UniProtKB/Swiss-Prot annotation:
Belongs to the ATPase A chain family. One of its GO terms (cellular component) is proton-transporting ATP synthase complex. It holds the Pfam family ATP-synt_A. It comes from Geobacillus sp. (strain WCH70). This is ATP synthase subunit a. Key component of the proton channel; it plays a direct role in the translocation of protons across the membrane.
Length: 236
């Protein structure tokens, strides 16, 4: 179901207040998780510390599968931040949505292409930055004309394609999930018959959406490290 976004103009710029609200809430939740997991560290981790250490090892495995740890270790915190932030963002719109005066205030921030494409642009821009920083501009530039200079236009197109697919893949999966949940929720509100018919599919789809949200967070982080490896590793 389509609802208008709460827009606000400031200094000639238009802001989506729902996006501002939801990315702020996502950031706060991730921050709270990080603080709770590291507040009372022990040699025998339990609870939240155990979870965070699992995330640390999981992201480390992603990085080491794409580049050597000496090079990739500097991206460890980036990978952890991305996978946790995107997973939490993907989950926020699953339990419910909040619509006030026809404006959608509560949703998954990753169900908006502006957010996902911004994340994708940030990741691709960082890959170019570190490519120049770690390899030097000359070696970095050679990557666009090797093995043949005639491939240069295709390499440029590839960079734009990588950015678009990285952002739109995440957006498409999360947005489609929320649309279907909204349709199923509409079935729940059509009476006893609609409730009985829709309740099992709704629960099943919410469970599947949790799985999809986790997979999309993993894919985004994995592709981030793939793009980083292509720019910073000499063997790519």
């Amino acid at each position: 179901m389509h609802h208008e976004a709460p827009l606000y103009e400031f200094l000639g710029l238009t802001f989506n207040l729902a996006n501002v609200l939801m990315i702020t809430i996502t950031s706060v939740i991730v921050f709270i998780i990080a603080v709770a997991a590291t507040r009372n560290l022990s040699m025998k981790p339990t609870g939240m510390q155990n979870f965070l250490e699992w995330v640390v090892d999981f992201v480390k495995g992603i990085i080491k599968s794409n580049m050597d740890w000496k090079t990739g270790g500097r991206f460890h915190l980036l990978g952890m931040t991305l996978i946790m932030y995107i997973f939490v963002a993907n989950m926020l719109g699953l339990p419910f949505s909040i619509v006030i005066d026809g404006k959608l205030w509560w949703k998954s921030p990753t169900a908006d292409p502006v957010i996902t494409l911004t994340l994708a642009i940030m990741v691709v821009a960082l890959s170019h930055y570190y490519g120049i920083k770690l390899r030097g501009f000359q070696e970095y530039a050679k990557g666009f004309v090797s093995p043949m200079w005639i491939l240069f236009p295709l390499k440029i197109i590839e960079e734009f394609a990588n950015t678009l697919t990285l952002g739109l893949r995440l957006y498409g999966n999360i947005y489609a999930g929320e649309i279907l949940l909204a349709l199923l929720a509409g079935g729940l509100a059509t009476g006893v018959g609609g409730t009985i018919a829709a309740i099992i599919p709704t629960i099943a789809w919410q469970a599947f959406s949790i799985f999809v949200g986790a997979i999309q967070a993993f894919i985004f982080t994995m592709l981030t490290m793939v793009y980083m490896a292509h720019k910073v590793s000499h063997d790519h």
